[in-house]
From Swiss-Prot:
Binding locations of substrate: 171, 219-220, 274, 281-284, 404-405
One protein family per Pfam: Acyl-CoA_dh_N
Assembly description: Homotetramer.
Function statement: Catalyzes the conversion of isovaleryl-CoA/3-methylbutanoyl-CoA to 3-methylbut-2-enoyl-CoA as an intermediate step in the leucine (Leu) catabolic pathway. To a lesser extent, is also able to catalyze the oxidation of other saturated short-chain acyl-CoA thioesters as pentanoyl-CoA, hexenoyl-CoA and butenoyl-CoA.
Organism: Pongo abelii (Sumatran orangutan)
Superkingdom: Eukaryota
GO CC field: mitochondrial matrix
A GO BP entry: branched-chain amino acid catabolic process
Protein name: Isovaleryl-CoA dehydrogenase, mitochondrial
Catalysed reaction, written as an equation: 3-methylbutanoyl-CoA + oxidized [electron-transfer flavoprotein] + H(+) = 3-methylbut-2-enoyl-CoA + reduced [electron-transfer flavoprotein]; pentanoyl-CoA + oxidized [electron-transfer flavoprotein] + H(+) = (2E)-pentenoyl-CoA + reduced [electron-transfer flavoprotein]; hexanoyl-CoA + oxidized [electron-transfer flavoprotein] + H(+) = (2E)-hexenoyl-CoA + reduced [electron-transfer flavoprotein]; butanoyl-CoA + oxidized [electron-transfer flavoprotein] + H(+) = (2E)-butenoyl-CoA + reduced [electron-transfer flavoprotein]
Pathway this chain belongs to: Amino-acid degradation; L-leucine degradation; (S)-3-hydroxy-3-methylglutaryl-CoA from 3-isovaleryl-CoA: step 1/3
UniProt keyword list: Acetylation, FAD, Flavoprotein, Mitochondrion, Oxidoreductase, Transit peptide
EC id: 1.3.8.4, 1.3.8.1
């Protein structure tokens, strides 16, 4: 396996994180607690990858996270994306020949975790770009498509997205209505997509559409297309004003006689459901790094706060109830880490199951929401004030119980997997 040093090459120095000094009580947005990766079972190269990425993000992203959330805008998105490209993390699972790093899903999860630790919103946009778009092209694109799109997506010159959901087709995604009609060497797309992460910014999008409206079952009539910004008939609506993940731009996509070359089919005509479902398992796995990062961010802020804030003549972290909160938050995070990391390792070894890809994001997402709530409680009144980041962590965490398949759908996936063993 390529080392983190080889991954980053000449692009950055090899940084090492150090444990915080005794008496560490920083209240800055980018204060860090050490992560014990000996317990997490990471190799030396994977630990170095985390340390390098974390240092870069805590310097260049974390101090901006509150303003990104408040304004619902990341003003330097394009510049930052190119920095991520220079760092080598946008194409972390892509082959080296296209500019990628040629690493695995565990490394992808680690980067997703650290970006989300610095900013949940930017972490979500990273996941949509690096996994939903780039990784789909890597896994399903032909050579011409890979050569055309991957280098610019991996360098950060282009921003990528994926579009499945529609206003009336979320969990029931195969009921989509976006229609693609073949005319000569092109397809004409008509319809809408909704809730599309990176939609307002994307230069390249993987879009699913119906090419056979009469197919039974309906899933047999879906095709995946590569759509580019600027194609005639393709436009985006205004970005949505969301509860959380603010600054990760989301919008509706509009297709009005949009002309897409037949050469832009990803995979095969009417076989898009295979691209969709196999990609969804890996999407759930990689996005599970998001809740891990949010939980770590809650701890990064809460643990120091509990050892600064005083009540009744002592630090509130010495109260038994607050010690209980710290223990609950920490053990939830560590249990989630072991599950996510081990499923990622299994996928890297060729053993990837829908049941456990659903399981890791189900469990980590619900734990992240609870950890964020516990963090708010530890902060008391300050936790309810937007000058502190605790509310942002909660609003960001809740998204992971909804996106990439709701918690309810994930439970169905797991339950059906067991039922299939007893048919």
């Amino acid at each position: 396996m390529a080392t983190a040093t080889r991954l980053l090459g000449w692009r950055v120095a090899s940084w090492r994180m150090r444990p915080p000094p005794a008496g560490f009580v920083s209240q800055r947005a980018h204060s860090l607690l050490p992560v014990d990766d000996a317990i997490n079972g990471l190799s030396e190269e994977q630990r170095q990858l985390r340390q390098t990425v974390a240092k870069f993000l805590q310097e260049h992203l974390a101090p901006k996270a509150q303003e990104i959330d408040r304004s619902n805008e990341f003003k330097n998105l394009r510049e930052f994306w190119k920095q991520l490209g220079n760092l080598g993390v946008l194409g972390i699972t892509a082959p080296v020949q296209y500019g990628g790093s040629g690493l695995g899903y565990l490394e992808h999860v680690l980067v997703m975790e650290e970006i989300s630790r610095a900013s949940g919103a930017v972490g979500l946009s990273y996941g949509a770009h690096s996994n939903l778009c780039i990784n789909q092209l890597v896994r399903n694109g032909n050579e011409a498509q890979k050569e055309k799109y991957l280098p610019k997506l991996i360098s950060g010159e282009y921003i990528g997205a994926l579009a499945m959901s529609e206003p009336n087709a979320g969990s029931d995604v195969v009921s989509m209505k976006l229609k693609a009609e073949k005319k000569g060497n092109h397809y004409i797309l008509n319809g809408n997509k909704f809730w599309i992460t990176n939609g307002p910014d994307a230069d390249v999008l993987i879009v699913y559409a119906k090419t056979d409206l009469a197919a039974v079952p309906a899933s047999r009539g879906i095709t995946a297309f590569i759509v580019e910004k600027g194609m005639p008939g393709f436009s985006t609506s205004k970005k949505l004003d969301k509860l959380g993940m603010r600054g990760s731009n989301t919008c509706e996509l509009i297709f009005e006689d949009c002309k897409v070359p037949a050469a832009n089919i990803l995979g095969h005509e009417n076989k898009g459901v295979y691209v969709l479902m196999s990609g969804l398992d890996l999407e759930r796995l990689v996005l599970a790094g998001g809740p891990l990062g949010l939980m770590q961010a809650v701890l990064d802020h809460t643990i120091p706060y509990l050892h600064v804030r005083e009540a009744f003549g002592q630090k509130i972290g010495h109260f038994q109830l607050m010690q209980g909160k710290m223990a609950d938050m920490y053990t939830r995070l560590m249990a989630c880490r072991q599950y996510v990391y081990n499923v990622a390792k299994a996928c890297d070894e060729g053993h990837c199951t829908a049941k456990d890809c659903a399981g890791v994001i189900l469990y980590s997402a619900e734990c992240a929401t609870q950890v964020a709530l516990d963090g708010i409680q530890c902060f008391g009144g300050n936790g309810y004030i937007n000058d502190f980041p605790m509310g942002r962590f909660l609003r960001d965490a809740k998204l992971y119980e909804i996106g990439a398949g709701t918690s309810e759908v994930r439970r169905l996936v797991i339950g059906r997997a067991f039922n299939a063993d007893f048919h």
